[in-house]
Amino acid sequence: MIQTKDIIELTDTYGANNYHPLPIVISKAEGVWVEDPEGNRYMDLLSAYSAVNQGHRHPKIINALIDQANRVTLTSRAFHSDQLGPWYEKVAKLTNKEMVLPMNTGAEAVETAIKTARRWAYDVKKVEANRAEIIVCEDNFHGRTMGAVSMSSNEEYKRGFGPMLPGIIVIPYGDLEALKAAITPNTAAFILEPIQGEAGINIPPAGFLKEALEVCKKENVLFVADEIQTGLGRTGKVFACDWDNVTPDMYILGKALGGGVFPISCAAANRDILGVFEPGSHGSTFGGNPLACAVSIAALEVLEEEKLTERSLQLGEKLVGQLKEIDNPMITEVRGKGLFIGIELNEPARPYCEQLKAAGLLCKETHENVIRIAPPLVISEEDLEWAFQKIKAVLS
């Protein structure tokens, strides 16, 4: 049997050096548990950046995959498939939007939102050609494609990739006055994460989302919520925007939309926004393919049937409370909503993630000094308590 060190050696030899993973190879997974080739078990506290909210290899989702794979997997968008229509309806009703545009990865859905906002600005708002602007927040993470990188405030993400997309205005996260000051007659959209994930589980001030939406409505600016990581139960609400009772003009969804089994993403908005497209103006050969749609329908049903959103809220509140009781001056803050939790340290978090790995827990540092805790939402209370005791031992 091939061993962990052999796999890592192959990866280092032939793989582009664009990731810095923990030195572990996962060869098997089920629920909240994963195994390496040697049979060592670990609890997954990352959930593939919230793509595995329903747990690894959920039986209902896997059965949907197998059933659809035995019938048809890809039609392209040149033809209709029997899965796309039902999937459209499922997502439209979930988001309470009239239209859905399917893609594959989260970054593709972000690019879709950028194109939508710009075209809406020209066709509907009547912004002068090639002058549309998009407002984003500092420390955002919307992906790695050129549009997403152009919106980043992290210069390392941009280094060597210029020129960037023009018309991007960056403001401090959660700063309402900065948003007001940044809006011009050319502003097409305000795109933000309702809770910033890669920034270290950064939660905006209470009421900010609602106030920002009101400003956008007053100024005729689209309010676009990137819920790729935060959506679909992760924060203890179906969407993180729900914490402020906010319904954005457009949702960007991905990750858990595919149940940790098959990539699928989308933008969802009403007809007056997504209706700006005509055939040929945007698309994807694999976007909305029947295999992805069948998997996604099952993934959304699992969230509903197993009440994973409510579970995230209940377990998350308990875990945040426990983590806040750990007595160590190295911990500067514990923050989170649902099972989307950040433990901020006053020193680099990577060594502690490596210690947690040795203790049987897999998590990843983010924003240098934050340990992100985001297990699959199917985790049992007993398993979460076991994880807490391990975390407490390492951080005490």
From Swiss-Prot:
Entries under SUPFAM superfamilies matching the protein: PLP-dependent transferases
One cellular-component annotation, GO: cytoplasm
UniProt entry keywords in alphabetical sequence: Amino-acid biosynthesis, Aminotransferase, Cytoplasm, Proline biosynthesis, Pyridoxal phosphate, Transferase
EC number(s) stated in the UniProt entry for this protein: 2.6.1.13
Biological processes annotated in GO: L-proline biosynthetic process
Catalytic EC class: transferase
Pfam families the UniProt entry points to: Aminotran_3 (PF00202)
InterPro entries for this protein: Aminotrans_3, Aminotrans_3_PPA_site, Class-III_PLP-dep_AT, Orn_aminotrans, Ornith_aminotrans_bact, PyrdxlP-dep_Trfase, PyrdxlP-dep_Trfase_major, PyrdxlP-dep_Trfase_small
Primary location recorded for the protein, binned into one broad class: cytoplasm
Localization (cell): Cytoplasm
Pathway the protein contributes to: Amino-acid biosynthesis; L-proline biosynthesis; L-glutamate 5-semialdehyde from L-ornithine: step 1/1
N6-(pyridoxal phosphate)lysine: residues carrying this PTM: K255
Signal peptide: none
GO molecular function: identical protein binding; ornithine aminotransferase activity; pyridoxal phosphate binding
Cofactor: pyridoxal 5'-phosphate
Chemical reaction(s) catalysed: a 2-oxocarboxylate + L-ornithine = L-glutamate 5-semialdehyde + an L-alpha-amino acid
Membership in a protein family: Belongs to the class-III pyridoxal-phosphate-dependent aminotransferase family. OAT subfamily.
PANTHER family membership: AMINOTRANSFERASE CLASS III, ORNITHINE AMINOTRANSFERASE, MITOCHONDRIAL
Chain's role: Catalyzes the interconversion of ornithine to glutamate semialdehyde.
Record's protein name: Ornithine aminotransferase
Provenance organism: Bacillus anthracis
Gene behind the chain: rocD
